Amino acid sequence: MSRYVFTSESVTEGHPDKICDQVSDAVLDALLAQDPSSRVACETVVNTGLCLITGEVTSNSQVDFIHLVRNVIREIGYSGARAGGFDATSCAVLVALDQQSPDIAQGVNEADDHSGDPLDKVGAGDQGIMFGYACDDTPELMPLPISLAHRLARQLAAVRHDGSLSYLLPDGKTQVSVVYENDRPVAIDTILISTQHTSEVEGISDENGIRERITQDLWTHVVEPATADLPLKPNREATRFLVNPTGKFVVGGPQGDAGLTGRKIIVDTYGGYARHGGGAFSGKDPTKVDRSAAYAARFVAKCLVAAGLAQRAEVQLSYAIGVAKPVSILVESFGTGKVTNDELTALVQDHFDLRPGAIIEQFKLRQLPQQRGGRFYQDTAAYGHFGRPDLNLPWEDVTDKASTLLQAEAQQQKQGSSL
C-alpha cells in the first residue's frame, strides 16, 4: 500500500499577485465586452500606493482604465481606513499599453496551415505546451487538496466581506495537506491559514491572545462551514490547524509585498497535482493558447473522467505560433484507464477540435464578457479557473461530450472484438 501526504495552497482575492490577476482580467473583460475581437495581453504590477497596467492591446473599445482599476481594488476591499498603504481612491494608477506587434498579429490573423475552413484561419498566438487534468477525488473532478484550499480561501474572504469577522483584512493564504493511500484521499492532515488582521482584535492587543482568538474564530467561521458538505472532513483533534505561524499579520497586501500578474499559476490550476506548461491565464485574450488551450485541455481531461474512461487523466497539448492545429496531443491515465493511453489519445484526436479558432467558438470565449453583463474573466482570476460550479464555466460542462465519448469507446471495443 502506498501512503503519502500531498499539499496544495490557495490565496484570497486580496493577495498582491491576485489583485494583479483580477485587474488584468477586468481590463480584458472591459475590452472584449465592447469589441469581442480585441487582442489583449495586459500585465499588472502593484506596490505600496501604486498600480501599473502595461502590455499590448489592439481594440476599438473605449475604456476608462483608471476608473476601472480603482473599482477593482475597491471591490476587493482596499479602501478607507483599512486600506493599509494601498487605497483604491488615492493610489497612483499608471497606464502603459501599446498595440500588439504586427509580427505576432499576422500569424494569429491567418494561420500558416489554413485550408479554407474559417476555423483554420486563427493561428496559435504563441508556441507552448498546456496541460489539463481531472480526477475523481471530488464531484467537480478536481484534486482534493486544491479544491479544499480554494474553499477555505473563499470562505475566509466571505466572512470578511459580510462582517462576521470584522477584524480581517484582505490579504490571506490557505494551505491543505491531504493523506492519500493508494492514490485515494483518506484524511486531512494539516490546514494552514495565514490571514491579515487589524492590530487589535476585538479589544485584544497582545500577540498570543490575538492569535488564539483568530484560531478559534477561523475554525468556527471558516473551516467548519467550508467543509460541511464534504464526506472527508477535518477533525479538530486529529487535523493539525496552523494559523498565522509567525505570530501576527498586520502589514499585508501591496504594502507588504509587490504583486505581479501570472505569479500564481499553480493556484489557478491543479495545486501542483498535475503538470503545468508554464503559461499564465489572466490578462490574455482567447487567441493566446496559454489560456484557451489550457481550458480545452481541462475540458478533454474532465470528459474522459466523467465518461468513466479513467479515474485520473492528464492531457498535454502543444502548439506552434501561427499554426492552427496542435503539434501534439497526449493522454496519460496513470494506470487508471479503462483502455490504453494510446486508445484514449486516439479518441481525443477523433472527437475534439483543438484548433484555437474551434476552441474559441465552442466556448464562446470572445462573447462571454458581453453575454454576462461585462464581466466574466475577472471572476476566474481568484479561487481557480477549474472546478468552479459557482461560475458556470463552459469548459466545465462535460455531460454531453462525456456521453458521446463513452458511446464511441463502446463502439470501438465492439468493432475490435468482432475482428
UniProtKB/Swiss-Prot annotation:
An annotated GO BP: S-adenosylmethionine biosynthetic process
Binding annotation for K(+): E43
EC number from the UniProt entry: 2.5.1.6
GO cellular component: cytoplasm
Cofactor(s), names only, from the UniProt record: Mg(2+); K(+)
Positions contributing to ATP binding: H15, D171, G172, K173, K248, F249, D257, R263, K264, A280, K284
Enzymatic reactions: L-methionine + ATP + H2O = S-adenosyl-L-methionine + phosphate + diphosphate
Keyword Cytoplasm attributed: yes
A Pfam match: S-AdoMet_synt_C
Residue sites binding Mg(2+) per the record: D17
Entries under InterPro entries matching the protein: ADOMET_SYNTHASE_CS, S-AdoMet_synt_C, S-AdoMet_synt_central, S-AdoMet_synt_N, S-AdoMet_synthetase, S-AdoMet_synthetase_sfam
SUPFAM superfamilies: S-adenosylmethionine synthetase
Region (Flexible loop): 100-110
PROSITE patterns hit by this protein: ADOMET_SYNTHASE_1, ADOMET_SYNTHASE_2
Residues reported to bind L-methionine: E56, Q100, D257, K288
UniProt keywords, alphabetically: ATP-binding, Cytoplasm, Magnesium, Metal-binding, Nucleotide-binding, One-carbon metabolism, Potassium, Transferase
Co-factor remark: Binds 2 divalent ions per subunit.
Subunit structure: Homotetramer; dimer of dimers.
PANTHER family attached to this UniProt entry: S-ADENOSYLMETHIONINE SYNTHETASE
Its biological purpose: Catalyzes the formation of S-adenosylmethionine (AdoMet) from methionine and ATP. The overall synthetic reaction is composed of two sequential steps, AdoMet formation and the subsequent tripolyphosphate hydrolysis which occurs prior to release of AdoMet from the enzyme.
Stated family: Belongs to the AdoMet synthase family.
Name of the protein: S-adenosylmethionine synthase
Species this chain originates from: Prochlorococcus marinus (strain MIT 9303)
Gene name of the encoded protein: metK
